[in-house]
C-alpha cells in the first residue's frame, strides 16, 4: 500500500520503496544510500523539521545493516504532528551512508552511536568517532557476527 508521501516522491521522480505502515499508521520508506542526503533535504524543506530519533540494527548475520530515521513535522496549531520513518540499508562489507547532520543537528550523537556499535560510516559527519566504546576497541559490538573478547581490561576511575 502506497502512502501519501510515497505517492508524492513517485510524482517527482524520486526513487524509493514503500514499506507500508507501522502499527501506529506511520508511513515507512526505504531510501537508497546514494539518494538519502538529497531526499533528506527535500523532507526538511517539505516540513519535517525535527529528527526525533535515529537508530541502527543488524538485519541478519552476514546480511545488511540498517539505519532508521524517525522524522516529525511540527507545526503551530497542530495537535497530532505528522510522522515518517525512513530506512536506509547498507552493505556489511562497506557500510557507508551520507550523514544528515547538516540537515538535522539532533542526529549528531545518534549517528556516532550507530557507528560505534555497528560500524556504519556516516559520510560528512563532522565528529564521527566512537562515543561509548574506547577508541582502542576492536569490532562492532551490536553486529550479529561479533565475537566478544574473552577478557576485558578493567580501569580504575579516579
UniProtKB/Swiss-Prot annotation:
One GO BP: photosynthesis, light reaction
Keywords: Chloroplast, Membrane, NAD, NADP, Plastid, Plastoquinone, Quinone, Thylakoid, Translocase, Transport
A GO term for molecular function: NADH dehydrogenase (ubiquinone) activity
Pfam families recorded: Complex1_30kDa
Keyword Thylakoid in annotation: yes
InterPro entries: NADH_DH_suC (IPR010218), NADH_quin_OxRdtase_su_C/D-like (IPR037232), NADH_UbQ_OxRdtase_30kDa_su (IPR001268), NADH_UbQ_OxRdtase_CS (IPR020396)
SUPFAM superfamilies: Nqo5-like (SSF143243)
GO CC terms: chloroplast thylakoid membrane
Membrane-protein topology: Peripheral membrane protein
Keyword Lipid biosynthesis belongs to the record: no
Transmembrane regions listed in the UniProt entry: none
Localization (cell): Plastid, Chloroplast thylakoid membrane
Reactions the enzyme catalyzes: a plastoquinone + NADH + (n+1) H(+)(in) = a plastoquinol + NAD(+) + n H(+)(out); a plastoquinone + NADPH + (n+1) H(+)(in) = a plastoquinol + NADP(+) + n H(+)(out)
Enzyme Commission number(s): 7.1.1.-
PROSITE patterns per the UniProt record, alphabetical: COMPLEX1_30K (PS00542)
Function: NDH shuttles electrons from NAD(P)H:plastoquinone, via FMN and iron-sulfur (Fe-S) centers, to quinones in the photosynthetic chain and possibly in a chloroplast respiratory chain. The immediate electron acceptor for the enzyme in this species is believed to be plastoquinone. Couples the redox reaction to proton translocation, and thus conserves the redox energy in a proton gradient.
Sequence similarity: Belongs to the complex I 30 kDa subunit family.
NCBIfam families: PRK12494.1
Subunit structure, as described in the record: NDH is composed of at least 16 different subunits, 5 of which are encoded in the nucleus.
Protein name: NAD(P)H-quinone oxidoreductase subunit J, chloroplastic
Gene name of the record: ndhJ
Amino acid at each position: 500500500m502506497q502512502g501519501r508521501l510515497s505517492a508524492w516522491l513517485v510524482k517527482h521522480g524520486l526513487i524509493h520503496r514503500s514499506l507500508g505502515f507501522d502499527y501506529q499508521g506511520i508511513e515507512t520508506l526505504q531510501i537508497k544510500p546514494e539518494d538519502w542526503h538529497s531526499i533528506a533535504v527535500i523532507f526538511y524543506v517539505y516540513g519535517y523539521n525535527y529528527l526525533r530519533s535515529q537508530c541502527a540494527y543488524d538485519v541478519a548475520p552476514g546480511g545488511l545493516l540498517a539505519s532508521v530515521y524517525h522524522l516529525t513535522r511540527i507545526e503551530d496549531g497542530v495537535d497530532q504532528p505528522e510522522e515518517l520513518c525512513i530506512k536506509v540499508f547498507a552493505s556489511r562489507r562497506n557500510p557507508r551512508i551520507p550523514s544528515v547532520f547538516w540537515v538535522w543537528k539532533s542526529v549528531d550523537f545518534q549517528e556516532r552511536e550507530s557507528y560505534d556499535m555497528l560500524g556504519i560510516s556516516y559520510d560528512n559527519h563532522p565528529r564521527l568517532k566512537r562515543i561509548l566504546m574506547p577508541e582502542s576497541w576492536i569490532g562492532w559490538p551490536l553486529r550479529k557476527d561479533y565475537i566478544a573478547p574473552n577478557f576485558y581490561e578493567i580501569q580504575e576511575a579516579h
